[in-house]
Amino acid sequence: FFSEELMESDERLKFISNFSGSAGWGVITASHKLKSAIISDGRYQEQLKKEVSQKEFVILDGGLNKIIEFLNLYKQIKIIGVDTKLITINQFKFLESELKIKNIKFMLSTKNLVDEIWNNKPTIPQQKIVDVDTKYVGENFVSKIKRLSKIILNHSSEALITFKPDAISWLLNIRGNQLKYTPVVRCFALIHKSKKIHLFFEHDLPQLSKLDHGEIIFTNMNKFQSILKMFAGESFLVDYNSTPLFVLSALKKNKIKYKHISCPISSLKVIKNSVEQKNFKEVHKIDGLAFIKFWSWFEHLDKNNMFDEEYL
């Protein structure tokens, strides 16, 4: 879900390289004669040097564009495998356009090769969904869905697919518990103009919430293709910046038309109602108190001892 906080079962970059930062790209070469690459931004350059073997990896500072730079070092690389579940549509479009002149071919797959060698991979924990009472958010999910449905219709489409757990959690007034610090519900959604919603989850379905009824259906991710067959010939809205590449091939396979839209749920949720504004102020007070307690503790530390950011 392209989140900076991952479950242990998603930490493929850490497994293959020992890099434990929250953002990064990996390019793993097939030949032992060529170094692989680890790419992350300036926040993690010192951490990369500590955690990653520079005998095995080239460490690059930046983002997706550094993959191009790495491939310029090793011009003998002509075929690149891509996990279409771990790259967004626009990210792939960028790579494709930049590498076209280099005659590099892509091998697209929904299987991840790291998973193939990851013995004793951590299991995905059971997800429990908590419903957030309207008194805390100021608008029930039925009203929010109705507003979203109008946007879908105004774009001459039948449905929206979104891979943004924060947007889905806001829309349906729900929270999840799979991540330690980010209480979103990890799923993706197919939201139809008829107001019927399919929520797709990894492996075991979550413990039931009041949402799991006729109009909102909890479904396993492996049913995505079969669900799409129901909508053949329709037109979908897709956010190319947050939707993984495999979705496009699934839509094409089921003869569903699609077009790009910046996630309309994100646009809706950024405008806070009066209840949300009031509760934001209360949360800021709690947050401020926590900071004051921390600062008091910090001020009373024994200054004769050496402390660094890792200790703190």
What residue spans do the PLM features occupy?
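N-terminal accessory/capping or targeting/presequence segment of soluble
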Residues: 1-73, 83, 87, 91-230, ...
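Conserved catalytic alpha/beta cores of large enzymes that bind or transform nucleotide phosphates
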Residues: 77-81, 208-264, 269
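Divalent metal-coordination and catalytic microenvironments
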Residues: 26, 80, 280
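Long, K/E/R/D-enriched contiguous segments that form extended
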Residues: 267-312
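Terminal amphipathic helices with adjacent charged low-complexity linkers/tails
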Residues: 98-123, 243-279
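Short acidic (Asp/Glu) and glycine-rich catalytic loops that position anionic groups and cofactors
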Residues: 49-51, 230-231, 257-263, 290-299
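A glycine-rich phosphate-binding loop feature that marks nucleotide/adenosyl-phosphate handling sites
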Residues: 1-2, 165-168, 241-244, 297-299, ...
